Amino acid sequence: MRATLRERELNEPLPIYAPRRQPLPNTRIYAQHLLEESRRLILGQAGLTLVLINDDQLRRQLTSSLAAEFGRRVVHESTAPESNGVVTCNWDWWLEHQEQLPAPAQLIVGMLPIASLDNPLTSARVERMKQQGEDWFRTLLLPEALSLIPTAIAPLRRSGGRLAILDGRLRGRSWGDQVLNRLEPWIPLQRLLPE
């Protein structure tokens, strides 16, 4: 008997759960939406789950709420999760530590990695572009976010996991199509089925 082991092809379609009509991250109902959807995604999936959110306050609030329900399975920015654990982290932490973690069964994108204007460096760069009359979002913030996506999802492609995007801007903004194009090839998941 002969067996050939190889890594999954990186060009196989990635299953993506991204419902239409999700709230935007700056709305009052978004935190509750994020908690409810994350809970559903975690309950229906065996294996490691990562939740990516750059907003510190929202991420810590979600971590606390998920830990209240799922206990010690939920950790914040830890490289030693349980096999069916949940790691909440920001995008930079995930990109820096993904080699130290097992391949995830799913990635939950709470918020797309668009830099916040609360960051002084980002704010200064945007202000300079505004003064020059440039489209600072499409010239600076969107390309930076799009450049992070392939590296962030590569382990998921190799493991055959699924991607869930809970940021309403994906379907609610015209530039959301650019994000979906960056994720190609992918197939839509209309429903969440337990693993």
Predicted segments — roles?
Residues 158-194:
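C-terminal/domain-terminus segments
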Residues 7-8, 54-59, 169-172:
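Gly/Ser/Thr-rich loops at beta-strand to alpha-helix junctions
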Residues 58-62, 96, 174-175:
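Phosphate- and divalent-cation-binding pockets in alpha/beta enzyme and binding domains
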Residues 15-58:
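Conserved interdomain hinge at the start of the Helicase C-terminal
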Residues 22-24, 83, 87-172:
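Conserved RecA-like P-loop NTPase helicase motor core
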Residues 4-8, 78-80, 91-92, 111-115, ...:
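Short, acidic/turn-prone active-site loops that include or flank metal/cofactor-
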Residues 50-78:
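Conserved helicase motor "Helicase C" RecA-like lobe of SF1/SF2 P-loop NTPases
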Residues 1-6, 180:
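Post-DEXD/H (motif II) to motif III coupling segment of the RecA-like Helicase ATP-binding lobe
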